[in-house]
């Protein structure tokens, strides 16, 4: 591959991708969303128009769908599992928490879709997003209408290590939506990690996690078992086809 020869003619698709690729040496990301492939700390991020909304964008991380955002419409959640999270959290807040003083932590940032949603739904809430990829965090701030800190604060770090630093009873809601590819890192699914999460929750607090799994539900069963070791009340939300083992889902 080191042999120097005439470069083959690139296809139109390859030329387009190369044109849209952002040089890693740029010190400042583009302002506003622009379709293209962008180098990030953990690989590549691709930003694609969703084809349905004028300002709708789909974010892919290393080829896997990560987030969907409609600029100017933070309460529009396109991913079904995010709508489930929103419904569960809002119901729990109404029954058990003070909506005026919410402290919400998001493990896994992506495009900060859920943080944007809750910052808009609860204007006085404080949302902390823990994102592993520093470059991605920089990009999404430039691309999308994410409220500034303290409404939405992005903290760069590994989710497990950062969670271990949380003071006891310092969070009202903790949302785990962390993936490496299409799988949650094992270290974030253990009983030990779950105990760390529980210790960080204030009385009446809620831990809600996104579990991607196949038809056998092996991962979901293991996660439920770990949760039941720590929490008194555990609930699983999914569509019936997934619970019946007919397809992969969240």
What positions do the PLM features span?
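Rossmann-like AdoMet
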Residues: 1-95, 117-121
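The AdoMet/dcAdoMet-binding core of the Class I SAM-like
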Residues: 38, 53, 72-203, 215-218, ...
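A generic fold-level signal
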Residues: 42, 99, 246-248
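Short, histidine-centered active-site or binding-site loop motifs used for metal coordination
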Residues: 63-65, 178-180, 211-213
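Short, solvent-exposed coil/turn elements at secondary-structure transition points
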Residues: 64, 160, 240-242
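Short, structured loop/turn "capping" segments at alpha-beta junctions
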Residues: 150, 207, 234-235
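Conserved beta-strand signature within the Rossmann-like core of class I S-adenosyl-L-methionine
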Residues: 204-211
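Substrate-binding/catalytic lobe of Class I Rossmann-like enzymes that use SAM or dcSAM, i.e.
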Residues: 212-214, 218-250
């Amino acid at each position: 591959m080191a042999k120097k020869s005439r470069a083959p003619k690139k296809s139109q698709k390859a030329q387009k991708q190369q044109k849209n690729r952002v040089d890693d040496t740029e010190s400042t990301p583009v302002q506003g969303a622009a379709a293209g492939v962008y180098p990030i700390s953990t690989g590549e991020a691709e930003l694609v128009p969703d084809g349905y909304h004028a300002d709708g964008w789909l974010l892919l991380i290393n080829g896997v769908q990560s987030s969907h955002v409609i600029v100017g419409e933070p309460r529009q959640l396109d991913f079904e599992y995010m709508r489930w999270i929103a419904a569960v959290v809002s119901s729990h807040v109404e029954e058990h928490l003070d909506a005026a003083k919410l402290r919400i932590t998001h493990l896994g940032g992506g495009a900060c879709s859920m943080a944007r949603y809750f910052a808009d739904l609860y204007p006085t809430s404080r949302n902390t997003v823990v994102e592993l990829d520093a470059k991605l965090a920089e990009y999404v701030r430039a691309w999308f209408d994410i409220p500034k800190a303290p409404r939405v604060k992005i903290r760069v770090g590994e989710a497990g290590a950062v969670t271990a630093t949380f003071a006891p009873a310092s969070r009202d809601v903790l949302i785990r939506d962390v993936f490496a590819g299409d799988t949650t890192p094992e270290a974030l699914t253990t009983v030990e990690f779950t105990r760390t999460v529980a210790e960080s929750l204030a009385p009446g607090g809620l831990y809600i996690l996104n579990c991607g799994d196949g038809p056998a539900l092996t991962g979901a069963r293991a996660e439920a078992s770990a949760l039941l070791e720590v929490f008194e009340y555990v609930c699983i939300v999914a569509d019936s086809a997934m619970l019946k083992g007919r397809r992969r889902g969240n």
